[in-house]
């Protein structure tokens, strides 16, 4: 018997894989939107409920408009991007690769925007050493759901470059100043972000292979059913697939 594979199904296999990738991208965007809304709510609540801490961080306290004006546009962008993705999925249209790279650039710039706004109103080392730079790792982690090695690496590159440029802009950096204001200190932090992007890319490749195997198995099963009729029992289909493997 000739091997039964998804390759003989051609376009249906490619379409099924594309739809799985789009669904994974949709899950990632939904997670990003939820995280951003949660961060905004927590930040606004902390600003109002912890006035003493707010005043210690910034002269006059952290104004309520700051987190809203910083994170609000990114939340709106993410919701719009998610709606666009859903529309394209409903019309069986792919998400252009250039659009995915641009989307990764915009999303990963949120932590940088927060650091920039905070650093312009408080001590730079506080903004750079606080929680906002850690958000880069969340975006790098979620990039695995893009199922593309280079998109994860791109996310790591954007995070690494933005953090290093912000440190140089806010401090600026030197070679022989205080340790936390030196170029090699902050470049090492950026290097970790870049390596995180590479590791996330390897995980994304592994996840994509699992998706490909699942889609290939489903396509082969459908082909067996089409060849021998709808009344073939699942046990017979499994035996045929095992024989052709």
Model-derived features: where do they sit?
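Short, Lys/Arg-rich, polar N-terminal cytosolic tail immediately upstream
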Residues: 1-24
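N-terminal membrane topogenic signal
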Residues: 21-37
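Hydrophobic transmembrane alpha-helices and their membrane-interface boundaries in multi-pass
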Residues: 35-140, 159-161
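Hydrophobic membrane-targeting alpha-helices
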Residues: 45-49, 117, 165, 169, ...
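Hydrophobic transmembrane alpha-helices
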Residues: 103-125, 143, 149-185
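Alpha-helical transmembrane segments of multi-pass membrane proteins
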Residues: 108, 134-141, 190-197, 201
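Alpha-helical transmembrane segments and their immediate juxtamembrane flanks
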Residues: 171-214
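Regulatory cytosolic signal-relay segments
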Residues: 197-245
